[in-house]
Regions:
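Conserved, folded interaction/cargo-binding domains in eukaryotic regulatory proteins
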Residues: 146-153, 160-161, 183, 190-196, ...
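Intrinsic-disorder-associated interaction segments
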Residues: 9, 187-190, 194, 243-247
Length: 259
């Protein structure tokens, strides 16, 4: 069984690809999560204060479009870019639920799977965050309530691995020394980000390479909305020219992720 795997074997692509979540990738034509740092993109700049001619003025200390790394029960760090070594990917659905009355805002999330071709139980006791299962032939014929529900449920690509931030700073813009190769989890629900990161995994699968054997360099791309606001999406570059060695600590991390 997949969950019995505890060792990375680069000579058994099919088994390892299944374990690392890329067995179902096709060409374009064809838990210990709480202990992992969380990766996200910081869309808005962080502001601070500085003194100019005896007066305090607001200044931008961390630019928008940086990668944010939230350390569990610790600080947050920011990098102009990042290099990740992905160990595996998983998939899930999630839905944002706005709180009413005394209830807080929350997310409904399903369990994770190595594909989205099955029904996934969620933390509300239903499946797929309430989204109807199976292929929908005529979306427009559905009741408006059902269409709204389907639109509210997001596909999520969850990436696990190690990350090294580029030029890391703290929330005040001060340079910091962040330990390299920090274990992370990254929940990717933006549609364009889902596709761009997914292409890296698809390219690995086409070449029968395991995610852990290669690194991905991350930049960001700015996107302007109709109201003038800007949001950022990942701009990944997969390095297929260099094969990374597997060390005992990598085996240990993989075992921890699979347990």
């Amino acid at each position: 069984m997949i969950n019995d795997l505890q060792t990375i074997n680069t000579n058994d692509y099919d088994t390892m690809a299944k374990a690392m979540g890329i067995a179902n990738e096709r060409p374009a034509t064809a838990s210990k999560q709480s202990n992992l740092a969380r990766v996200k993109i910081q869309h808005s700049p962080l502001m601070g204060k500085t003194e100019v001619r005896g007066k305090e003025v607001n200044v931008e200390v961390v630019e928008g479009g940086t990668y944010k790394l939230d350390i569990p029960n610790g600080a947050s760090y920011y990098g102009t870019g990042a290099i990740i070594r992905p160990f595996m990917q998983r998939f899930m659905y999630k839905k944002y639920v706005m709180g009413t009355g005394g209830a807080k805002n929350r997310y409904v999330k399903t369990i994770m799977s190595d594909n989205l071709n099955i029904d996934l139980k969620d933390n509300d006791g239903t499946f797929n965050c309430g989204k109807p299962s199976g292929w929908i032939d005529d979306f427009n014929s559905l009741p408006q309530k059902t269409k709204d529900l389907i639109k509210a449920v997001k596909r999520v690509r969850v990436v696990f691995g190690n990350i090294t931030l580029t030029d890391p700073t703290d929330e005040k813009g001060n340079s910091v020394n962040v330990i390299a190769a920090t274990p992370f989890i990254w929940e990717i629900d933006n549609r364009d980000a889902f596709k761009s990161i997914g292409k890296c995994f698809s390219d690995l699968a086409k070449s029968k390479r395991l995610p852990v054997q290669h690194s991905i360099t991350l930049a960001t791309q700015s996107n302007e909305m109709n109201n003038g606001n800007v949001f950022y999406t990942p701009a990944p570059t997969l390095d297929m020219t260099k094969t990374l060695d597997i060390h005992p600590e990598d085996q240990e991390m993989f075992g921890n992720l699979m347990s």
